Amino acid sequence: MAKKLLGLALLAACASAAHAADLKVAIDPTYEPFTYKTADGTPTGFDVDIANAVCNEIKRKCVFVEQVWDSMIPGLQARKYDVIVSSLSITDERKRVIDFSDRYYKTPSAIVVKKGTEYTGPASLKGKRIGVLKGSTQEKWAMGELKPAGVTIVPYEAQDQVYLDINAGRLDGTVADKVEVHGGFLRKPEGKDHGYVGPDQYDEKYYGEGIGIGMRKGQKELKEQINQAIKTIRSNGTYDTIAKKYFDFDPYGN
């Protein structure tokens, strides 16, 4: 009987250890090519592959948790998951409430409207309706730079909903990550009549230092492990292999 109880205790301990090895990773699967789903519902994309590479380095298993973008940080604080790997910009505002890893990519944002739209500055879009992802840095930029010029800013729970409403004529355009809007809209048939206007947007006042992995404050050991993992995959070729699946340039940035 004692041996049986000991065996059960060991099994429970092993199960507990296996559970502890899982790293719950929040993603918004509506953000192609960074986080989206295959036809069978499997999470995929640049962010997903980076998360799996990091998990491999720190010897933990990634378990992906789908989350609406605007609830990402509240969900992290509520311990619904351990980290956010979903194109989360490292900004001063966010650093006040959560911690970040070192950056793992940095790409510009851009305005997308119908081709032929004359643009010399925000005032050129006066009277137009521009859709943005709710809670995003692009929303911050649009509210700070476009709204004062008379542009109506319409926040959405998911970026793919923005594209649907552009095609339906309910929106005139969007402000989005330049790579995401290319992969998720412009390169598709429904985006063929639209294009970029204005300069690429890098303003750190809105967009911060690049994209990092978000985690709760005080997780010093996890942060150190993840930062080392990012350094390792950058140096051993894993990062480049992942990047080449999705891009024809180095998304790490300058």
Language-model segments: residues:
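Bacterial N-terminal signal peptides that target proteins for export
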Residues: 1-7
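Bacterial N-terminal signal peptides
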Residues: 7-15
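Sec/Tat signal peptide C-region and signal peptidase I cleavage site
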Residues: 1, 14-22
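Proline/Glycine/Serine-rich low-complexity intrinsically disordered segments
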Residues: 21-254
